[in-house]
Regions:
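Terminal targeting signals and extreme-terminal segments of soluble enzymes
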Residues: 1-223
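Single conserved hydrophobic/aromatic residue that forms the stacking wall/gate
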Residues: 221-232
Length: 232
């Protein structure tokens, strides 16, 4: 089973009622003993699109409220609005009677849209200043064996050479580098879908957010379906 197929399997949720689902988090997508935030986003994203009448999330936000353990979770979906062109709702991730995470999203049907595409933008200049062959595989095991989180092993992640902080000499002047991490992300075996994008949104260091809120990292993602690559 390839990476893409494993990811899709890890998102399989069991329906208990019209708007309630259960899942045992897949430990391949953990950070230590807790599920990775991007994986949780993808799981809640899947639950939302399973309930709302529109198939594709066009905007979403997530709040991490409490720690989640490697135990069964319940996903409760509430519909806010269901219109002709869009619908919206919220997913509450519950464990041991605690609401641990919420995911709010608005959905539409991209596959039915026609006409001018005004969303396409050019790639950032940084993707042209180094050849892709110069990018470095994300591997924290070079610091300490076993330090690379399990979720990183579920995809290919190549970091821009200027952002490979773990390979810098200890006496390097860090002020000469931007506080950013640009990378090519690839989940071999399939074309990136909307759930991959939710997963990718919390892949690259620094951590985007935790239960205390956003940590000030601005993300920009593009995807190239032809080579199964997400670039962030």
């Amino acid at each position: 089973m390839n990476h893409f197929e494993k990811f899709q399997e890890a998102l399989e949720i069991e329906q208990k009622s019209e708007n309630t689902f259960t899942l045992i988090p897949n430990t391949n997508y953990f950070v230590g003993n807790t599920p990775h935030g991007g994986y949780l986003m993808a799981v809640m994203h899947r639950a939302l699109t399973n309930v709302l009448p529109h198939s594709t999330a066009i905007s979403s936000s997530v709040q991490y409220l409490d720690r989640i353990d490697p135990e069964p979770i319940t996903l409760e979906v509430e519909t806010f609005k269901a219109g002709r062109g869009s619908s919206s709702g919220i997913v509450k991730l519950i464990q041991n009677n605690r609401v641990c995470t919420t995911f709010t999203g608005t959905c539409s049907d991209f596959n039915h849209m026609k006409g001018f595409d005004g969303l396409e933008t050019a790639l950032p200049k940084i993707f042209n200043d180094k050849d892709k062959s110069d990018y470095v595989a994300l591997n924290y095991d070079e610091i300490t064996k076993g330090f690379t989180p399990s979720f990183i092993h579920q995809l290919e992640c190549s970091i821009h050479p200027d952002h490979v902080w773990w390979k810098r000499e200890k006496d390097t002047d860090s002020s000469q580098y931007d506080a950013r991490c640009s990378a090519y992300l690839k989940m071999g075996g399939g074309k990136p879908d909307q759930f991959c994008l939710s997963f990718y949104s919390d892949i690259l260091p620094p951590v985007v957010c935790n239960k205390y809120g956003a940590l000030g990292c601005c993300l920009l993602y593009t995807s190239d379906a032809a080579d199964e690559t997400g670039r962030g």
